[in-house]
Amino acid sequence: DALGYAIYRLLPGPGVLAGAVTPRDEADAARAAAIVAALGSVDVGQGAVVAQGLCLAVEALPGTDAMLAGVAALPSGLRPDSGRGRGLFYKAAKSGQDRRIDLPTLGPATLRAAAAAGLGGVAFQAGSVICLDLPEMKRLAGELGLFLWARG
């Protein structure tokens, strides 16, 4: 708003917006951020799912919904032990992405898909990801037992 653009109201600044983030979640988010940065350098995707340091999925052309559905369908033998951390979905803008017209977006449907995939939460690059209906996202995260974290 300070610059005259209402879009900034949709781009949360850093902080935990719902739930609680553990040290394991912090480590998974750092790993996912590194993966997403690497994906961005070759213009592949804006998201990754990481659990206990293991990459379970990366976002590509089919998008976030398809990626999270794929994680939900993983057999238990291919998933890390949920007792040691459920993992997270991380989303960020690609390096060099035109932030005037092409920002990544999250919304309530993303949280529902993350919960269906058995994840512990959703983290995203603070100030660079549009959050549609943030009050509903916060409420829904609480209802679903997820954290929602704008990672700075």
Question: Can you describe what each PLM-predicted range is?
Answer:
Residues 1-111:
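Conserved mixed alpha/beta catalytic, RNA-binding, or beta-rich assembly cores of soluble enzyme
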Residues 108, 112-151:
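C-terminal binding/interaction regions
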